[in-house]
Amino acid sequence: MSKQQPTQFINPETPGYVGFANLPNQVHRKSVKKGFEFTLMVVGESGLGKSTLINSLFLTDLYPERVIPGAAEKIERTVQIEASTVEIEERGVKLRLTVVDTPGYGDAINCRDCFKTIISYIDEQFERYLHDESGLNRRHIIDNRVHCCFYFISPFGHGLKPLDVAFMKAIHNKVNIVPVIAKADTLTLKERERLKKRILDEIEEHNIKIYHLPDAESDEDEDFKEQTRLLKASIPFSVVGSNQLIEAKGKKVRGRLYPWGVVEVENPEHNDFLKLRTMLITHMQDLQEVTQDLHYENFRSERLKRGGRKVENEDMNKDQILLEKEAELRRMQEMIARMQAQMQMQMQGGDGDGGSLGHHV
């Protein structure tokens, strides 16, 4: 008697259906189970509202115990690296978010060396990932590479400062830079547009590479294409952050209350906060891919080239040492051979003298 075939493996309604179409669902389930990792760096002068904006973006308090330094402490203050990691879960999707803050940037009178600490940190994360990737246990690598850098630009100037230009050029081949105009509520709409245009012109003039959003695919829906167009047109993003809930038009909103009215953080007519958050969420995967395929690969290639030359030099040094030792051994062997020959000649001469003396006796 033949066994009955399990009905769950029979699909009579769609003959010829193999099931490859289910692969994206498998990838999705695996990704959701594993969770996602993202590292965001924020850089800018003190007082531009970096911490407030980050707390507003992710609806959390990443800096509950921060102490604001006084003016005297800022004069000789050096750049520090403060990494805060939080686990965020939304509808079953887990995100391990690391925010790297850089307090002290631009505060000291002499900012000549303020880049070094930040650049060293970025390179150290690349180096750590390269080391882990080259190890035996590669299944559980924690990705601490910096995937995006929000660079905060002061709204009180007339464009980029020399410090802004120098810093962005120092890191633009290492990380995705997203320029952000801080405290946009200090500017009128016309002032904001003029400042944006001036910053973009200076970025192009100095050949600074910022993160460019990829074009929408031709098969994307029109709403997504329009969203992408609006996001691109908003760079650099002019933003307002606030941790306070205030009442506006009968509802509680995050915002700032002024004598002349209310600035709502999440109102796209007031600032680009929602656009910045939308860009970060919808392009998080692309930011990671650009980090992996461009910035990390550049670092890895340069690192392996330097490592190759280093090994080559070490091998040359070893060969040179071996040659020198072989030459030294040959010299010692020749010296010993000469000494043996001299001793043999002396012994032969001594035997002759002894014989004649005996003969005379």
Swiss-Prot record:
Entry-linked Pfam families: Septin
Sites bearing Phosphoserine, chain numbering: 218
Region (G1 motif), start-end ranges: 44-51
Subcellular location: Cytoplasm; Cytoplasm, Cytoskeleton; Cytoplasm, Cytoskeleton, Spindle; Cleavage furrow
Family: Belongs to the TRAFAC class TrmE-Era-EngA-EngB-Septin-like GTPase superfamily. Septin GTPase family.
Subunit relationships: Septins polymerize into heterooligomeric protein complexes that form filaments, and associate with cellular membranes, actin filaments and microtubules. GTPase activity is required for filament formation. Filaments are assembled from asymmetrical heterotrimers, composed of SEPTIN2, SEPTIN6 and SEPTIN7 that associate head-to-head to form a hexameric unit. Interaction between SEPTIN2 and SEPTIN7 seems indirect. Interacts with SEPTIN5. Interaction with SEPTIN4 not detected. Interacts with SEPTIN9.
Entry protein name: Septin-2
Species annotation: Pongo abelii
